[in-house]
Design a protein with these regions (language model features):
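Internal intein/HINT superfamily modules and their associated LAGLIDADG
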Residues: 1-125
Length: 125
């Protein structure tokens, strides 16, 4: 069995998850701003990303760099084939919220900022 290198070990000696690069973060947040939905199910907040199945490789990229969300599908509804990725719970609160709080401003995209702010207010984030 191949041993992990010293460059990808944390202090416990376990392999660490590769941290997203600044490009990864910016690209991912751009996708969320352009295609994401900020809301919830009435009980808990969630960020949802729904796109056509032709974007499967993009969803796999998201899964590899931002593990913690959940990918559903493919689905077919109304003649449309799509995947749906969702972020909820601890992953949303501890991983995505800080990224969005630090980077999403009304000057960048006022509509998305309003939706994000409404989600935070409704679910007391």
């Amino acid at each position: 069995m191949k041993q992990p290198s010293a460059t990808n070990l944390c202090f416990t000696g376990n392999s660490t998850v590769k941290q997203p690069t600044p490009f990864d973060i910016g690209f991912f947040l751009g996708i969320l701003v352009g295609e994401g939905h900020f809301g919830g199910d009435g009980r808990q907040p969630q960020i949802t990303l729904r796109m056509h199945t032709r974007h499967e490789s993009l969803f796999r990229w998201i899964e590899a760099r931002f593990p913690g969300g959940k990918l559903y599908g493919p689905y077919e509804h109304g003649g449309r084939r799509y995947y749906q990725w969702m972020a909820r719970g601890a992953f949303l609160r501890t991983e995505l919220m800080p990224l969005l709080d630090e980077r999403l401003t009304p000057e960048l995209d006022s509509k998305t900022f309003e939706r994000f702010s409404a989600m935070k207010a409704r679910y007391r984030l």
